[in-house]
Amino acid sequence: MVSCNDASFSALRIKRAFLRRTVLEARKDVMSNQVSISTANIRGAFGGFFIPGMYTALWAGFVPYLKAKLSIGEDVLGSMILVLGVGSCLSMAIAGKLVENFGCKKVVLLASFIGMLSLAIVTMCSTIATTTAALFFFGIGVGLSGASANLQAILTEKVSKKHLMGAYHGGWSLGGFAGPYRR
């Protein structure tokens, strides 16, 4: 006798197997150069670096204000930045699985949204605890966007047979210049 839970578990296993198969087929197509590349793919991968570069630069410029606003010393600020790094490392550990299940584009968009939203929340926080929690989520956005954008860049570079990685990372730097820019 099959229970409802067994049936839903089987359906989930079938869905995961299908997703894994399609991702593996896509990887084989990329490796055998059976996939064409468009300028939209290249621009999308560039944007995947530009946007995180922008909000990371905004964060860097915001650190002195945050320190003064919360009246904290370097030790507390260092601990808060450590929490940001922990969020980033944890998200990098699962980024490959997320990309495998949902694709680079969706993961980069989600990560950019998480990064920008959490940075906006950091600016509104008035306590150390809430700011630290928001920085943890900011780290998640930074880590996810970095790992998934680099994976997309690698795939795009392999298909196009051009050396694009320097240009993509240049996009991160351009985002860093554009982020804190004010007229």
Task: Name the predicted role of every residue range.
Residues S38-F62, F136:
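Pair of pore-lining "gating" transmembrane helices in MFS-fold secondary transporters
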Residues L144-K158:
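Intracellular juxtamembrane helix-capping segments at the cytosolic ends
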Residues A129-F137:
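Paired small-residue
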Residues S71, G103, M124-A129:
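Helix-breaking motifs and short loop linkers at transmembrane-helix boundaries and internal kinks
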Residues F113-S126:
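C-terminal ends and interior cores of transmembrane alpha-helices
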Residues S91-G103:
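Helix-to-loop junctions at the C-terminal end of transmembrane segments
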Residues G85-V86, S173-L174:
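Short hydrophobic/small-residue motifs within alpha-helical transmembrane segments
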Residues K105-V108:
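Primarily marks hydrophobic transmembrane alpha-helices of the MFS/SLC 12-helix fold
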